[in-house]
A protein has these predicted regions:
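N-terminal Rossmann-like dinucleotide-binding module
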Residues: 1-53
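Catalytic cores of eukaryotic secretory-pathway lumenal/extracellular enzymes that build
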Residues: 15, 81, 85, 113, ...
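C-terminal helical cap and adjacent loop that interface with cofactors, partners, or active-site loops
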Residues: 19, 51, 291-424
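Short, Asp-centered acidic motifs that coordinate Mg2+ and/or phosphate
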Residues: 35, 74, 154
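Beta-loop-alpha module in the N-terminal Rossmann-like domain of NAD(P)-dependent dehydrogenases
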Residues: 53-117
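Rossmann-fold dehydrogenase core element
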Residues: 113-130, 150-155
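Predominantly a Rossmann-like dinucleotide-binding segment in NAD(P)-dependent oxidoreductases
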Residues: 131-281, 411
């Protein structure tokens, strides 16, 4: 394919922005990172240095980018949840193609504004529902399309977030409050609902959901617990100990985005200071969090097929686990291995996922790389069909989440058609 190299701007140089920038370096013949906008100096300067970005293309605010004439092909939006829709609309109006981290917006109106903006300005939009692009997803869909289990009847899908990851992001961290970010289902698991819909291959019609902030509450705080882990006499016995999460992981390695996000420039002194003064050193029972720590979502599709999704914050971290029940067999999978059981033959066939999906950059089982590459290939060939998570598809997925939240809060079953009529 004789196509040009695509130039991309990164908005938000945190964990997700850094991942996409690093993935771009694996495909230098297809793309390059030409600019970055990030308010935090350490993260901004690090990404700029690693990608040799010219000083004139290094910005502390994304608004500054738009003061210049268009100088890149696309933008990757990896800002905080409540900072996705505004830049998406603005960059669409300036003719940039857009790859945006989920969620597209935090309510139906925000999502619709983004979709209308990209359609009006004839730019491509891809939303990072990365699980659609994972290697095992392609294998699963191929098995199902070839009739491996007959007609899909029901799906069970579990996301064990992991107790320490949940505490980091949704109790102490940036996604702990709905008014500052979004509900946990939207922030963490929208691509799970999207993936279920993609696997079933049908439109969701009805949703119900249950969940709450059951455990990470002040009334569950042990009697002798301190406000901060560094002062707490129970720290060594607590599974949510901040020193164990951050300090020990820093000392033992390897360093990951969770440790790095605590203080930016890593040193033992900086981590201790962050735990003493910042949000990540707080007792998990003494935070200002309000998002649910567990949730189930029940889905009914137009065909009559059903699915249940479970988000477990208090859990051992592990791969997502799925069971797909069909009329002629069932599939069990965890992202690394697929088990196909035939009712007729009473036999299990095991399928290992191809090794090339387990590279150092195989986030979401290769889905992150696949999502970025499909977006760039769409731009290089002027072929939006290469994007499988475009505007209307993503809008439907977001409405599934919004319906689930209405159900959870109002204690009722919600029809998806209700969302199409909701306007502020």
């Amino acid at each position: 394919m004789n196509a040009k190299k695509i130039s991309l701007i990164i908005l938000g140089a945190g964990g997700r922005g850094t991942i996409y920038a690093n993935l771009a370096r694996l495909m230098p013949e297809k793309m390059e990172i030409s600019a970055v906008a990030e308010p935090r100096e350490f993260f901004r300067e690090r990404l700029a240095a690693e990608h040799h970005i010219p000083r004139e293309n290094v910005f502390s605010d994304w608004h500054e980018v738009l003061k210049r004439p268009k100088f890149a092909d696309g933008v990757i939006i990896c800002t905080q949840d409540r900072m996705h829709a505004e830049p998406a609309v603005a960059f669409a109006e300036h003719g940039y193609h857009i790859l945006v981290e989920k969620p597209l917006g935090v309510d139906p109106d925000e999502c619709r504004r983004v979709v209308e903006a990209v359609q009006k300005n004839h730019v491509m939009l891809s939303v990072c529902h990365v699980m659609r692009y994972a290697n095992y997803t392609r294998i699963l869909r191929d098995l199902i399309s070839r009739g491996g289990i007959g007609q899909i009847i029901s799906v069970e899908h579990l996301e064990p977030v992991g107790h320490w990851r949940f505490a980091h992001s949704y109790v102490r961290g940036n996604w702990r409050r709905e008014d500052e970010s979004s509900p946990v289902l939207l922030a963490k698991s929208i691509h799970d609902l999207d993936w279920i819909s993609y696997i079933v291959g049908d439109h969701c019609r009805t949703v119900s959901s249950f969940g709450s902030r059951m455990f990470f509450r002040g009334e569950n705080r042990p009697e002798k617990a301190a406000d901060r882990c560094l002062d707490c006499p129970l720290e060594s016995e607590c599974p949510y100990s901040a020193p164990r999460f951050y300090l020990e992981r820093f000392r033992k390695g390897p360093i990951d985005n969770y440790v790095e996000s605590v203080c930016g420039e890593l040193s033992e002194a900086n981590i201790l200071k962050a735990m003493r003064e910042g949000p990540y050193g707080r007792c998990v029972f003494a935070c200002d969090n309000d998002v649910a720590d567990h949730q189930v979502v029940n889905l009914e599709f137009a065909s009559g097929a059903t699915a249940v999704f479970t988000l477990a914050g208090c859990s051992r971290y592990g791969e997502r686990r799925t069971v797909i029940f069909g009329s002629a067999g069932e599939i069990r999978c965890d992202g690394h291995k697929i088990e196909l059981y035939s009712y007729l033959r009473d036999r299990v066939t095991e399928i290992d996922i191809e090794p090339d999906s387990r590279t150092p950059f195989s986030y979401h089982n290769g889905g992150d790389k696949g999502c970025l590459e499909s977006f760039v290939d769409a731009l290089r060939t002027d072929d939006p069909s290469r994007i499988v998570t475009g505007a209307e598809v993503s809008l439907e997925t977001h409405n599934m989440v919004f319906a689930a939240e209405i159900s959870r809060q109002e204690k009722r079953t919600v029809l998806l058609q209700e969302l199409t009529g909701r306007r502020k």
